[in-house]
Amino acid sequence: PTSPLVFVPSSPRLSPFMHPPSHHYLETTSTPVYRSSVSSSQQQLSREDQCGTSDDSYSVGESGAGAGAGAGGFEMAKEMRFCAVCSDYASGYDYGVWSCEGCKAFFKRSIQGHNDYMCPATNQCTIDRNRRKSCQACRLRKCYQVGMMKGGVRKDRGRVLRRDKRRTGTSDKASKDLEHRTAPPQDRRKHSSSSSSAGGGGKSSIIGMSPDQVLLLLQGAEPPVLCSRQKLSRPYTEVTMMTLLTSMADKELVHMIAWAKKLPGFLQLSLHDQVQLLESSWLEVLMIGLIWRSIHCPGKLIFAQDLILDRSEGDCVEGMAEIFDMLLATTSRFRMLKLKTEEFVCLKAIILLNSGAFSFCTGTMEPLHDGAAVQNMLDTITDALIHHISQSGCSAQQQSRRQAHLLLLLSHIRHMSNKGMEHLYSMKCKNKVPLYDLLLEMLDAHRIHRPDRPAESWSQADREPPYTTSNNNNSSSSSGGGDGGPSSAGSGSGPRVNHESLSRAPTGPGVLQYGGPRSDCTHIL
């Protein structure tokens, strides 16, 4: 009788998946490209190693015994990686992400040399396999957006098996853990602080970072360009225009919070300080982002990829044309200065941190819990801005002038923000447009922080249009529905008011409330 283990001509029943790894079968010229003629040492490799060895040889590991013929193809397809930047086939894991050879080399050239990439369009170019070379500025921006970092480069350039690397990493981690447990307490604290600073992101300490590291983290934290997705026909009316703008603002606020959490050192601040900084500067941050998107389109304001407005379209809303004019003028000034990406991300972070670094009006704004930490972050980012300007090759006098010109423009953005806040509040009082929960929280918080009126009058003022005064304090206390009015908020916790006393109907818990009677926002920050 014929033994079942002898070599027989190939048939549909015979395949490497039907036999143990030690059994082989003969191939004829008509058989497929499945070959199992590999050594026993190669059979011990993981699936991940096998996929990268050869296309015409395929060995079956222990997990492959008894599987169907389609399982091997599925495993091979599952291990296929694509470049995070251009979606081409990835050649390896470089600079912190899976990338192809082209994008890896491009990012390496960009971070090693001095680059002044400028987008000829609107900073929204599509970067894919066919168009990745069309715009260097957008390609580099996408590299940062997907998480490519200078610190993510592999120091080993040899072709080392991933299995050995994993084993080495495991043993190194075990030895570090043992060293950490046996080290004295003071050395343990130093080790933990250095580990956190190397991790990057909002939890890392900004102290001790080089200016180049700070710039890389700031660029990597930038949010994506959003789409409005509102199907409203032109010409816009007052209601449709405000609906478009408030809807986009609410979407951007969510991404703004995510952006702030990625800033180095931000998550080390107390929750109170995080919320206060965001509440005090949210519209300025959104405006400088709008200016940056519109910098290469004279006469246009790019609110979203599918929402581009010109000055004339602002006439449909009373008071909007004036704000559009100020935005276009500031954008033109930044265009004249040829604002660079590194300068933009620094200015944006400075706006956030400078909003609460100094409490000029302690009667209307609670002081920060850790003002020194915020000031250190502000100083470090300012130093990064100065460092980048110093690399431009200009004279010291020209560098000082450029720094002054950039920082002076922040006062114009603050002025536009105040104008925009008053306009948005007037639209709210007129009930012209529905406002969303997050946008309402930010708007109400800004009204509380404002120093131009006493805190006791806010509850009454929130029910009246701006520029109208009311001295009726009884209405302020009665609108709170008991002892939750402004009078009780002034003792101990600063001039915080109960959100139940605000004019809008309750729409669930606020997402950025803090202090006293205001709800917790830890589920957002």
Curated annotation (Swiss-Prot):
- What does the UniProt keyword field contain? DNA-binding, Lipid-binding, Metal-binding, Nucleus, Receptor, Steroid-binding, Transcription, Transcription regulation, Zinc, Zinc-finger
List the Pfam families hit by this protein, alphabetically. Hormone_recep, Oest_recep, zf-C4
User: PROSITE patterns in the record, alphabetically?
Assistant: NR_LBD (PS51843), NUCLEAR_REC_DBD_2 (PS51030)
Top-level taxon of origin: Eukaryota
- Region feature (Disordered): 1-59, 154-203, 452-525
Q: Where is the composition biased (Gly residues)?
A: 479-493
Query: Which parts of this chain does the entry mark as a DNA-binding region?
Result: 83-148
Location of region: Hinge:
149-209
Low complexity biased stretches: 36-45
Which GO molecular function annotation, any one, does this entry have?
nuclear estrogen receptor activity
Q: Which InterPro entries match?
A: Est_rcpt/est-rel_rcp (IPR024178), Estr_rcpt_N (IPR046944), NHR-like_dom_sf (IPR035500), Nucl_hrmn_rcpt_lig-bd (IPR000536), Nuclear_hormone_rcpt_NR3 (IPR050200), Nuclear_hrmn_rcpt (IPR001723), Znf_hrmn_rcpt (IPR001628), Znf_NHR/GATA (IPR013088)
| CDD domains in alphabetical order | NR_DBD_ER (cd07171), NR_LBD_ER (cd06949)
Report if keyword DNA-binding is assigned: yes
Q: Does the keyword Zinc apply?
A: yes
Region feature Modulating, mapped onto this chain: 1-82
Q: In which tissues is it expressed?
A: Abundant in the liver, less abundant in the testes and barely detectable in the ovary and brain.
Q: Which GO terms describe its cellular component?
A: nucleus
Q: Which family does it belong to?
A: Belongs to the nuclear hormone receptor family. NR3 subfamily.
Its domain comment says: Composed of three domains: a modulating N-terminal domain, a DNA-binding domain and a C-terminal ligand-binding domain.
PANTHER family, sorted = KNIRPS-RELATED PROTEIN-RELATED (PTHR48092)
Query: Quaternary structure?
Result: Binds DNA as a homodimer. Can form a heterodimer with ER-beta.
Q: What is known about what this protein does?
A: The steroid hormones and their receptors are involved in the regulation of eukaryotic gene expression and affect cellular proliferation and differentiation in target tissues.
Q: What is this protein called?
A: Estrogen receptor
Q: Which gene encodes it?
A: esr1
